[in-house]
């Protein structure tokens, strides 16, 4: 199998990001964004996906974490899409239900080339998690789905602790990505012959 890997760099007035990704890795992850909770969530995602991931971001966290989180999601998504290449042979669809103590999240996705996000249950999240607005994480998932060109459904089913809910979501996303990216056939899984 061809090595499925990509490197992405992106520099704006808000963030400077350097990222390398190997889809079929060993779960070796190093994330440094200047925002500890983001590092924690992206490390979980990479580990549960089985990615080898190195991501560094120098962002305007003196404002807040918004640009850092959003741009990290976009770059990670772009790297994932690039690494998969023509997507021939992948399972394409993946899902996972992951508990974290009292919290449970379901993640379903399709590597369809048609980016879309459905993010349900975020009313369960407290207004602030790790010092930032809870809706920041919707922006991460939206940016990731757009960059990766995937249809992504995340349902926070129940739970009381915002950290636990998000942790179950990131673990679930990693596991669903691992399943969807798995090589299972030779041909493209599409009756129309294209994933665009």
From Swiss-Prot:
Top-level division of the source organism's lineage = Bacteria
The pathway to which it is assigned is: Amino-acid biosynthesis; L-histidine biosynthesis; L-histidine from 5-phospho-alpha-D-ribose 1-diphosphate: step 6/9
User: Mind naming one GO cellular-component term on file for this protein?
Assistant: cytoplasm
Residues in coiled coil: none
Q: Which organism is it from?
A: Oleidesulfovibrio alaskensis (strain ATCC BAA-1058 / DSM 17464 / G20)
Please classify the protein's predominant subcellular localization into one broad category: cytoplasm
InterPro entries documented for this protein: IGPD_sf (IPR038494), ImidazoleglycerolP_deHydtase (IPR000807), ImidazoleglycerP_deHydtase_CS (IPR020565), Ribosomal_Su5_D2-typ_SF (IPR020568)
HAMAP family in the record: HisB
Protein's recorded name: Imidazoleglycerol-phosphate dehydratase
Q: Write out the entry's keywords from A to Z.
A: Amino-acid biosynthesis, Cytoplasm, Histidine biosynthesis, Lyase
Compartments where located? Cytoplasm
Q: Per its record, what are the GO molecular function terms? A: imidazoleglycerol-phosphate dehydratase activity
Q: What is its EC number?
A: 4.2.1.19
Protein's UniProt keywords contain Amino-acid biosynthesis: yes
The UniProt catalytic activity note for this protein reads: D-erythro-1-(imidazol-4-yl)glycerol 3-phosphate = 3-(imidazol-4-yl)-2-oxopropyl phosphate + H2O
Its BP terms in the Gene Ontology are:
L-histidine biosynthetic process
The entry's family comment says:
Belongs to the imidazoleglycerol-phosphate dehydratase family.
